[in-house]
């Protein structure tokens, strides 16, 4: 197979939606928990390992704020990013987590920036934070079938979704 040198490589950044509080995270990890909580707790593990790293530019942003999402898209565009790939937590049977930032982008049309989804296709357990070696199921990933597909039909309408051609 001969490579097609006319194809352009496109850079699409993963967009992780953990940077805003949710009732589930409040219940499981404590009031106000976001991924920033873990960033702030980071400890150096070896000589020269600078931790915690304080976020530059946008600081400890909150994804509930439209101006944060706009600033992220502006910055991404400035540095050659062509779209965001939102990490999508769909657990089946109508249950989603961390959907607010993406839903607000979809409903408002802002920021006007191409997007796609990546299904975070796994259960959530507390094992990564549990120090006793056990684990507890927080949210089980289910596969009801057609519902998985049907839950996404509404996002195929916008013209902003990143297209691969």
Where are these regions (language model features)?
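Active-site beta-loop-alpha junctions enriched in small/polar residues
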Residues: 16-18, 89, 118-124
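Single conserved hydrophobic/aromatic residue that forms the stacking wall/gate
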Residues: 153-165
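Short, solvent-exposed loop/turn and secondary-structure capping segments
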Residues: 23-26, 96-98, 127-129
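The substrate-binding groove and active-site-proximal loops of carbohydrate-active enzymes
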Residues: 52-65, 82-93, 135-149
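Short secondary-structure boundary/capping segments
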Residues: 28-30, 100-102, 131-134
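Acidic, His- and aromatic-enriched active-site or binding-groove loops in soluble protein domains
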Residues: 103-124, 133-152, 156
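N-terminal regions that are enriched for targeting/export leaders
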Residues: 3-71
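Aromatic-lined substrate-binding rim segments of carbohydrate-active enzymes
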Residues: 68-87, 91-117
